[in-house]
């Protein structure tokens, strides 16, 4: 049954950390996908399963935020902004572990797709802030979607949102290395040279500056 499947997914929170890390990017979205299921028992199982992942979080800063993160995942319209603010205001001194990232990433995705430029800006800021706090292996499964979302924010009409998105992209490239972004610089240069994309060129110019700053000035050679 769907309920049994969700409970099984929740039990995977107690896997060996290495096994869990490899599976989180698949497990958590499946649980989130049935949080609003038409069947009450399935919703309850999904809620309980998600809480299990909150229980295995090792980052003490995120542990304190688990209640608001879970509320934002369950009712994004109502709580996303509050969760983003809580993440921005938190001073992290420990690495963000896989289970922490699995919860945070859903808040970021929701913020990136919000109609408010300010909400997108907050989501981008969190991406930039967390880049140095996350193990590369934990971030890789989410990377392509994050890049796509940040690049959309880079062409937002609001300058502050564009600038924050550009900084987030620069932080990701600096943390993960150019090899993870093989076509990024050529793509940004193509946009800069395309006179038909005047609205996108500002964002691309800012992003290119941040990326080159992250990689080092030798990239200008």
What are the language-model segments listed below?
Residues 20-35, 59-74, 98-112, 138-154, ...:
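HEAT/HEAT-like alpha-solenoid repeats
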Residues 38-39, 73-77, 115-116, 157-158, ...:
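Short inter-helical turns and helix N-cap capping residues of alpha-solenoid HEAT/ARM repeat scaffolds
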Residues 2, 43, 80-81, 120, ...:
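Residue-level detector of extended alpha-helical repeat arrays and alpha-solenoid scaffolds
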Residues 87, 197-199:
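Acidic, Ser/Thr- and Gly/Pro-rich intrinsically disordered linkers and low-complexity segments
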Residues 5-16, 34-35, 49-57, 73, ...:
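Hydrophobic residues within the alpha-helices of tandem HEAT/HEAT-like
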């Amino acid at each position: 049954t769907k309920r049994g499947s969700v409970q099984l997914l929740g039990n995977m929170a107690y896997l060996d950390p290495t096994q869990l890390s490899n599976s989180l990017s698949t497990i958590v979205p499946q649980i989130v996908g049935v949080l609003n299921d038409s069947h009450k028992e399935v919703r309850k199982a999904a809620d309980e399963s998600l809480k299990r992942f909150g229980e295995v979080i090792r980052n003490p800063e995120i542990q304190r935020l688990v209640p608001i993160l879970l509320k934002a995942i369950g009712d994004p319209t109502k709580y996303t902004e509050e969760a983003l603010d809580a993440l921005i205001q938190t001073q992290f001194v420990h690495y963000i572990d896989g289970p922490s990232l699995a919860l945070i990433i859903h808040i970021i995705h929701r913020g990136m797709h919000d109609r408010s430029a300010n909400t997108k800006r907050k989501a981008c800021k969190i991406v930039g802030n967390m880049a140095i706090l996350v193990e590369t292996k934990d971030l890789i499964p989410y990377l392509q979607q994050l890049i796509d979302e940040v690049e959309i924010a880079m062409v937002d009409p609001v300058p502050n949102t564009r600038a924050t998105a550009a900084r987030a992209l620069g932080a990701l490239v600096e943390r993960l290395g150019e090899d993870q972004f093989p076509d990024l610089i050529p793509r940004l240069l193509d946009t800069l040279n395309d006179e038909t994309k005047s609205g996108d060129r500002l964002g691309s110019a800012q992003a290119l500056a941040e990326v080159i700053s992250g990689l080092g000035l030798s990239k200008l050679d």
